[in-house]
Every structure is written in C-alpha cells, then in structure tokens.
Amino acid sequence: ATYPIKRYLSQSSYGNFNYSRILINSKKLVEDIKQKGVINNKTLVLDFPKESILNEKFYRHFIRGYFDGDGSLVLSRNSINFKICGTKELLEKIIDIFNNCSEYDYQKRVFKRWNNDKNNYYISYGGKNKTLSIMEYLYDNSNIYLDRKYKKYISLKNSEKVNL
C-alpha cells in the first residue's frame, strides 16, 4: 500500500502521546479480521478469543498486548500494583490463565470501574512476588511489547529494596 503513515498527538490527563492509526477500506480484509475475532468498540463486549482462533501457546502474548493497551503497572515507594480493565468475561479468563501459570492464587474477583450497568470491570493484584509472577509470564523471552511498560517490569525485576 502507498497510504502514508501519519503521526498524531494525543493530549489527555495522562500526558501527551504520539500515535498512528490505520484506516481499512477493503471489505474483504475487514471480513477476514472479523472472522479472527477483531470487533468494533471492543470495550464493553470483548471476550477472550476461542482456542480455534488463538492457540493456548499464544495466550501470554495476547494478554501482554491487551495489558499494553488496557493495563497498568504502578511501582511506588510503598506499593506495587498490577491492573487490567476489561469485560467481566475477559478478565475471569485471564485470572484462570494466571492461576494455571503461577504458584500464587489469584482470587477470581473483578471490580466495577464505575457505578453503572456497563460491562466494564478491572482486576488488581499487589505485592512484589505476585505481581512479578504475572509480569514474568507475560514478558519473559518476549520481544514485542510496549517499551514503557516493559521498562517498569525490568525495574520491578531488578528491585532489591522493594519487598512488599
């Protein structure tokens, strides 16, 4: 394609960020990606992909990409917190996956983001060891990630003084 990649500047309460976007005008391509589970306005309806679409060996890569977009890792002097926002169904599946890949028990508790009837929840886990277990699952031996969040993982991994 010859369509030029344009860069935009987003200004929000989180700060200023550069971003690019892609416009897809091919009906065939749109139908193909819909068959792979890509949907419009995913925020309130996204479910974890079925194994016929996403093989289990790629779960951590999917979750890492999702975390890069809709998650956070907060490292402060007194606390560590891992958080992902999404639909209740998606988050419950992610909790199951974390429990299958870790020695720690991640309670199957999802919290409402806002006091309304929308399917918008979050999960949150704290403590160095529990958080590090999740982050190692997501990032170890990976080379595609959001650099800003990867650097926080490395900071947590190399942290000797934080014992929460």
Short names for language-model regions:
Residues 1-164:
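Internal intein/HINT superfamily modules and their associated LAGLIDADG
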